[in-house]
Amino acid sequence: MFLVIGGLSMMSHHYTLGNIKSRTVGDGQHGTARWSTDKEIKQTYAHVPFKVREWRSGQNLPTEQGLILGCKGKTQELTALVDSDDIHCLMIGASGIGKTAFFLYPNLEYACASGMSWLALDSKGDLARNYGTIAKNCYGYNVSVIDLRNPTRSDGNNLLTLVNRYMDITRKDPKNLAARAKAEKYAKILAKTIVNPDGDDSNRGQNAFFYDAAEGLLTSVILMLAEFLPPDEEHPQERRHIVSVFKLVQDLLEPSKVKGKSHFQLLMGKLPPDHKARWFAGAALNSAEQAMASVMSTVLSRLNAFLDSELEQVLCFDSAIDAEKFASEKSAIFLILPEEDTTKNFMAGLMIQNLSRELFAVADENGGKLQNRVVLYCDEFGTMPPFDVLPLFSAGRSRRLTLVPIIQSLAQLEKNYGREGSEIIQDNCQDTIFGGFAPNSQTAEVLSKALGNRTVLSGSVSRGKNDPSQSLQMMERPLLTPDELKSIPKGNFIVQKTGQHPMRTRLRLFLEWGITFEEPYIVPERVDRAVAYANREDLERNLPQSSKAENADMRGAYAVSGRGGIAHEPVDKPRRRGGKQMKTYGEEDL
């Protein structure tokens, strides 16, 4: 009897809720989510010993180009987990989780060691200050700092650099059609980027004509500026920049002394009939006077954002690194954005958009891929104004261009790009790394759901007087609940990769990687740089002189000066025929 009672007592104590563990059971009836195994991690990610001292001395440089998404090993003896596939990577983390110290610094070091060209958005200036010297002195990089916070301490970033370069080649060799075609291509890319920064043509509606015509007109003015106003003995300083484009459009919009003709119409009439600048402006040139004025006003409104005395120190001087140099040589660009002045944030989107489109053009000339992998580290991507970034995601990956947008919340993407745009960006990121969320974060709930569910053991225990019982069943459980995501320790992250199970990983503080900083990289003060502007009069004087037959055939009514420019006053001595005074072209309209 005592044995029976003891046995029942033991059974009653054995059936406890604490003994029911949420271990994976069944055959995936409620979900099959799980973590990657060590074997799968080894097969998916390249394991590269992180040897900073050797790399900086030029020894044992890594050959695998890619992104560091984790590490293994002890301090100072770490092995980096590198994803070397053609990918985009979305990083999500709240402020203060160490996105720069744990993620960016190791990746910048590895990018330099593996020879990738890269651009880094830098909201505080720390990246440029700490890594400019290392990239230049230790790894032999071309370094450019575009500082929108202190433009007088910035390198130049002339948006017309490539247009000017190929137009100079064309001017020296008029038969070089390839150079002229490249100049026209880069001019069209820049015009489209400025007139249509968000890339959404669907919202134009009935105004589509004005925007399309504005793109053509802007392309036309850029080409004329690049071709006919190069530096010369009288004007040795470069005048071909975006601010001069604004000034020319404004001057050409003014009415001339020829009734019913603007300076723009007279200027276009002076060009040879087969000149491409005349063709690009055809939509505006052949429209009604009021419509043409609206087109030119649209161009001015788009260019108005560049009118800033400080920004001129950046925009009006030649770029230290252009797209072709960026793609073919080891180059690093630091784009410093002022957190306290969001009015200049549009420049970041414009520069990234224009650079990426130029890189696409370079890749297309090299068999559809860039010679060297290019990475754009877009820190604070969520605080930037929206721009036409979707083609960069969809077309950049196959061309060896990797984008790394770093955001604080998925809500930032939805706010800037809408629900559909946010989903497109997320779907085009083959890697997602996240960790460290605010207590009330909704992003943690979304990502918990994205990790999926697994089938776990569940059950209940009931105790009667003489018959304790236990019931077991299967149920679903998130791989990580939102609460568990919010409590992830600093430096720990979750990595999701397309076609793979998620990975729990750890990124160490940059000091534990063996990363040390050298002397700060400082761009010298350039407060004494005077800006030179183009003007309509010089442009008219430098236009090619047309033949008499061309002058007689021109539809625009005006007289032609002996130097090839446009004479807006009637000629001094009107011709007479048969005793009757002949009118000069355009005089009948006065």
Where on the chain are the PLM-derived regions?
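Short intrinsically disordered, low-complexity coil segments enriched in acidic
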Residues: 2-8, 443-450, 500-503
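P-loop NTPase motor domains
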Residues: 68, 72-76, 80-401, 416, ...
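Short, surface-exposed polybasic-aromatic patches that bind anionic ligands, especially phosphate groups
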Residues: 508
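Basic- and hydrophobic-enriched, low-structure N-terminal and domain-boundary segments
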Residues: 1-97, 101-109, 114, 152, ...
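Conserved ATP-driven motor cores of ASCE-family P-loop NTPases powering translocation/secretion/packaging/pilus
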Residues: 393-395, 399-494, 585
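General helical secondary-structure elements
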Residues: 30, 49, 473, 502-504, ...
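A short glycine-/small-residue-rich loop at the edge of a beta-strand within enzyme catalytic domains
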Residues: 46, 56, 346, 380-383, ...
